[in-house]
Amino acid sequence: MKNIILILLIILTGCTQSTNNYGEIITKNNISNLLSVISELKNSGQIETTLSGKIISTCPKKGCWMRVETGNDTLFIKFKDYEFFVPKSGVDGKEVVFKGTAFYDTVSVADQKHYAQDAGKSKEEIEQIVDDQYKLSFIADGVIIE
């Protein structure tokens, strides 16, 4: 009887969904819609929020940033004070929930080139970056990758 219970526990443990938390422990509650966040940002400089999406890519050098598809948009997400990193590989296409601060920011040519280098872009692609970009940015306090 003890063996049957032990086997059932092992099977049930193997069936649980794997969730990985990075940074601050967050929950999947109160996930905002990106369009409503963008609308709210028109009235304030930044907003604390929780969003979700699908990981497109992560920094292959350190895991210090990720690109996430949220609906029809793509967000570039960095992590608060470089206090944590996400996996450098193996998470593309996975669902992600992230909590932190959304705001508009100017991304310099130097930073864009740095991120392009990290992502393994060609020299020709990097040389085509010549203008600063003003875009929606996100600094995450915590991340859940499912």
Predicted features by range, described:
Residues 1-23:
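Bacterial Sec-dependent N-terminal signal peptides
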